[in-house]
Regions:
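Glycine/proline-enriched, intrinsically flexible loops and inter-domain linkers
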Residues: 1-111, 115-198
């Protein structure tokens, strides 16, 4: 299949069989293969690409307060992630997002946001950056919403990361065992906690 300019495998056919799905209103010929893939992840490990997700970085002294206003859920502490809906003032759903909080800003200081220090509210923590992940096909929709809501004083900077940032998702009971073979970093339960972000 393809979505938002990226081609992605929807399912994998057995060796020796043609990977063509017979589309029906019932279960297609892909059903058994998708079931086997799902069971493999549940019992062992699976990996899939998440590059096609929309990705945005927010920074500046007003970033936390801005995100706290447009997101319905709690903004996590540094090094943590949280799932949160984004709603309009009437409570209608704009998008279902994941927000991650980084510590001090990692990018070079530039533009009006970098010249502002401190913050007008107690909800500001100097130097924080935030990364939001959401539906890839809604990237432009999210961009328009963010732009409409951004303060005009330059206290918040929003950057669309697009395809510059690739992503992989690994899941299943053997996920940590695979990661241990790929890195010297501590990927134990204590070293890499659930919903951690570094």
């Amino acid at each position: 299949g393809d979505g938002f300019g990226l081609e992605a495998a929807l399912w994998f056919q057995q060796d020796g069989k043609e990977a063509v799905e017979d589309v029906t209103f019932g279960r297609s010929n892909a059903w058994d293969q998708v079931r086997q893939e799902t069971l493999a992840v549940r019992s062992s490990v699976g990996l899939w690409e998440t590059t096609g997700f929309s990705k945005f970085k927010f920074s500046g002294p007003g970033a936390r307060a801005y995100l706290d206003r447009i997101l319905a859920g709690r903004i996590p502490n540094a090094g943590r992630m949280a799932l949160t809906p984004m709603t309009n003032p009437a409570g209608n759903l704009i998008g279902d997002l994941t927000v991650a909080t980084l510590g001090a800003a990692t990018g070079a200081a530039e533009g009006p946001a970098s010249t502002i220090t401190g913050g007008a509210t107690g909800n500001t923590r100097d130097g924080e950056e935030f990364v939001l992940f959401g539906s890839g096909i809604a990237e432009r929709y999210y961009e328009r919403w963010f732009d409409q809501q951004l303060p005009t004083d330059g206290s918040v900077r929003c950057e669309t990361l697009g395809f510059e940032t690739a992503g992989l998702s690994i899941a299943g009971p053997n996920a940590r065992a695979v990661l241990e073979k790929l890195t010297d970093a501590d990927v134990s339960q204590n070293g890499m906690r659930f919903m951690a972000f570094t």
